[in-house]
């Protein structure tokens, strides 16, 4: 076991007297590079590195923006040497490995990929690799292929790969990941057939994140059929790379199918599919939807996402982006009823109108909380509404059409909403030619007044005012307090800013 040593002050060194297994357990709680450096203090500990079950290499916090390129290069080389040394030590001992975590800037991605087969041979359960880009994701990305061994592991339970220089997923044979429960792939390129192969080999998958995904458009069939059908899946996050979504078009016709009866949480950000073949989310509780149109779909303007929203209409919590609000305008007459929805959050945008919002609120008979991220879309100098190029109504009191106003007020007066929260109240649109502080804030106040004057069940309205000026807060406070009438018999209005918190109650 080795003799017990005394520290320089005469006290006993309790750690050195512990059994090897206990010391190894203690070292496993340290970042691996730190654990390796402790061998300078006690040579007896060095062999124990071979049996550490969790390897944690996080060097990201060590890179100072003020470092020179040469200092960064030397730091990266030193980091890679430490990882190589520890992996070699563990390979020699043929020890089992639970977790392999790497996060470092400035490391060549292909070098990191070479570590994957080494840890797979050790029966690793958890791989987490996060390598920020040195060039920026996009056209300059290298898209190194992920090693094929990673897709036939019999031990992997969790796999997370985030290479911001991009990674390529392409496996010749079958995929077999019988133990995999969590799969995160961020900044990856693959074709839809590879996605089908990947999902078919994950029979116990519970959490799937495919973020910043790029389809290999040139290799896609026509039409392109994408089916996500994993019975065990509970969490799904799917988004395509933002710049790719803004490109001209995804050329093949896309037919999309979701058959995930046990899914609880969905985050879906994409362009609208040409057709939703099947949408089945029987157990869905919370969803975040971000849909936008391709240039071709904007020209045709005949896209209908009714089937998709029919599939998620049983949610209790829903988040919609501003583009999704615009897309919903295509199915105002066929919008499903969200019977279970109690919490709705809407992100607003300066170019997006609210013409679909009255229809949406009308179809939420049990909605309790309504949250707006910003109050954008109207109040821009020389313009009446953010939907200037579209027909239809917008939930806006600036409209002179009394019939339209009557319809909107009728919709709001039947809403059961009890709480309205407005985040970033007072935030300007950000376009210099349209920005007018007084006009923007006055318009946002007018919208809040409309809620107060027409919604009878309101119990609380909270404005999170985006201003450091207390005087601005006081102005809004006084204007709202002077309202001659409100629809609710008892409604509290609260204004929260950086410095003060004001509230009053209508009685």
From Swiss-Prot:
It comes from the Eukaryota. LRR repeats lie at residues 135-163, 187-212, 214-240, 317-348, 349-374. Pfam families: LRR_At5g56370. InterPro entries: F-box-like_dom_sf, F-box_AtFBL13-like, FBD, FBL60-like, LRR_dom_sf, LRR_FXL15/At3g58940/PEG3-like. Residues 12-60 form the F-box domain. The keyword Chloroplast does not apply. SMART domains: FBD. This is Putative F-box/LRR-repeat protein At4g00320. It comes from Arabidopsis thaliana.
């Amino acid at each position: 076991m080795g003799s017990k040593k005394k520290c320089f002050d005469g006290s006993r060194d309790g750690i050195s007297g512990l059994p090897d297994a206990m010391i190894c357990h203690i070292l496993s709680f340290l970042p691996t590079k730190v654990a390796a450096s402790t061998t300078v203090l006690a040579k007896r500990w060095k062999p124990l590195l071979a049996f550490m079950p969790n390897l944690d290499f996080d060097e990201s916090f060590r890179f100072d923006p003020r470092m020179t390129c040469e200092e960064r290069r030397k730091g990266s080389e030193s980091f890679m040497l430490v990882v190589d040394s520890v992996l070699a030590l563990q390979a020699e001992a043929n020890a089992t490995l639970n977790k392999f975590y790497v996060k470092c800037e400035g490391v060549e991605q292909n070098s990191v990929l070479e570590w994957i087969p080494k840890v797979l041979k050790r029966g690793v359960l958890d791989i987490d690799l996060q390598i920020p880009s040195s060039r920026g994701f996009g056209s300059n990305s290298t898209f190194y292929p992920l090693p094929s061994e990673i897709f036939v592991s019999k031990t992997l339970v969790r796999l997370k790969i985030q290479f911001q220089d991009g990674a390529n997923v392409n496996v010749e044979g079958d995929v077999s990941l019988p133990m995999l429960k969590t799969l995160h792939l961020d900044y990856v390129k693959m074709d839809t057939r590879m996605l089908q192969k990947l999902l078919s080999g994950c029979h116990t998958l519970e959490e799937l994140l495919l973020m910043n995904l790029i389809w290999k458009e040139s290799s896609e069939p026509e039409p392109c059929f994408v089916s996500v059908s994993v019975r065990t899946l509970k969490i799904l996050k799917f988004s395509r790379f933002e710049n790719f979504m803004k490109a001209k078009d995804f050329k093949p016709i896309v037919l999309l199918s979701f058959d995930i009866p046990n899914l609880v949480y969905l985050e879906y950000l994409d362009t609208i599919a040409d057709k939703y073949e099947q949408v089945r989310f029987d157990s869905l509780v919370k969803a975040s939807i971000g849909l936008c149109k391709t240039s071709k779909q904007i020209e045709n303007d005949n896209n209908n996402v009714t089937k998709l929203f029919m599939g998620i209409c049983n949610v209790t919590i829903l988040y919609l982006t501003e583009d999704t609000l615009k897309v919903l305008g295509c199915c105002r007459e066929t919008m499903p009823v969200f019977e279970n929805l109690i919490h709705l959050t809407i992100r607003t945008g300066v170019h997006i109108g609210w013409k679909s919002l009255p229809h949406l609120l009308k179809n939420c008979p049990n909605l309790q909380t309504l949250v707006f991220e910003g109050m954008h879309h109207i109040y821009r100098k020389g313009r009446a509404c953010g939907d200037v190029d579209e027909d239809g109504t917008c939930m806006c009191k600036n409209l002179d059409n009394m019939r339209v106003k009557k319809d909107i007020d009728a919709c709001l007066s039947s809403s059961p909403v009890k709480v309205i929260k407005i985040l970033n109240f007072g935030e300007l649109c950000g376009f210099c030619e349209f920005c007018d502080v007084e006009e923007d804030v006055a318009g946002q106040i007018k919208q809040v007044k409309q809620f107060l004057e027409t919604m009878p069940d309101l119990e609380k309205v909270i404005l999170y005012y985006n201003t450091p000026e207390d005087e601005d807060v006081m102005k809004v406070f006084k204007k709202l307090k002077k309202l001659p009438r409100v629809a609710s018999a008892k409604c509290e209005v609260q204004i929260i800013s950086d410095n003060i918190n004001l509230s009053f109650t209508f009685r």
